[in-house]
């Protein structure tokens, strides 16, 4: 089975193109003083490409993953002097694995419905567990430490929190619910995608998160250094993800 990162791009009608173009031009006219030169460049670039109506091939999950890793590597080639080697490795590994959870059948049913619905006709009625949560419980602490000799036990918590919360989703699923969901819709698929036998998920990783996005989890004091590392990983991960999703190869 082929796994996809997002839905096929919608081709706009001429009327829709004209409407979006007018709205973006009005935005520039009314709020030009509020934008940076980079912001204006992006908006004008989007306007100029609205007429590009040729349908693009649907991006596979592997292609999207490779694009984000490449974006991170290009960024560090230019700005790497401002980061430690460990920081760069942490960000690149987060880019590599943050979307693994998209291999789950429910997500694939949304972005690749024809292929999935041939086998699962009721796929649209099943509630999806957010893909970031699944990604973060697919790797163990020991597997993480083997990714780089630079990684320590202390790095696991900020790293896994950045992957788990790379999108802001309500955090209402506990380990038994995730395991049950994965047994039906994820374990087989992630094993196929990664070309390795994923025998179990590591839902105990939830206990290592710096925070849970819900109203009932207990909060414990966290060292400022851990928060700083988490913010660095998540901030750059989101930066590169948004850059690639917008169609750019390089982040500024």
Which residues are covered by each model-predicted region?
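Accessory nucleic-acid engagement/destabilization modules that flank
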Residues: 3-12, 25, 31-32, 41-57, ...
């Amino acid at each position: 089975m082929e796994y996809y990162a997002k839905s096929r791009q919608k081709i706009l009608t001429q009327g829709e193109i004209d409407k979006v173009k007018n709205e973006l031009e009005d935005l520039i006219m009314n709020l030009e003083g509020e934008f940076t030169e980079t912001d204006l460049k992006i908006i004008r670039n989007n306007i100029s490409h609205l007429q590009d109506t040729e349908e693009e091939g649907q991006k596979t999950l592997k292609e999207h993953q490779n694009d984000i890793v490449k974006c991170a590597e290009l960024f560090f080639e230019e700005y790497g002097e401002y980061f430690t080697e460990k920081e760069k490795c942490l960000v690149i590994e987060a880019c590599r694995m943050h979307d693994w959870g998209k291999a789950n059948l429910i997500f694939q049913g949304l972005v690749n419905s024809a292929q999935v619905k041939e086998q699962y006709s009721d796929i649209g009625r099943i509630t999806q567990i957010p893909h970031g949560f699944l990604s973060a419980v697919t790797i163990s602490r020991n597997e993480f430490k083997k990714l780089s000799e630079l990684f320590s036990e202390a790095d696991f918590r900020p790293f896994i929190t950045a992957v788990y919360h790379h999108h802001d989703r309500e955090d209402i699923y506990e380990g038994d619910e995730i395991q049950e969901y994965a047994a039906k819709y994820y374990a087989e698929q992630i094993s196929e995608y990664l070309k390795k036998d994923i025998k179990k998920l590591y839902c105990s990783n939830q206990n290592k998160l710096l925070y849970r996005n819900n109203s009932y989890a207990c909060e414990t004091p966290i060292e400022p250094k851990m928060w700083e590392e988490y913010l660095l990983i998540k901030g750059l991960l989101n930066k590169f993800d948004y850059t690639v999703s917008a169609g750019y190869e390089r982040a500024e």
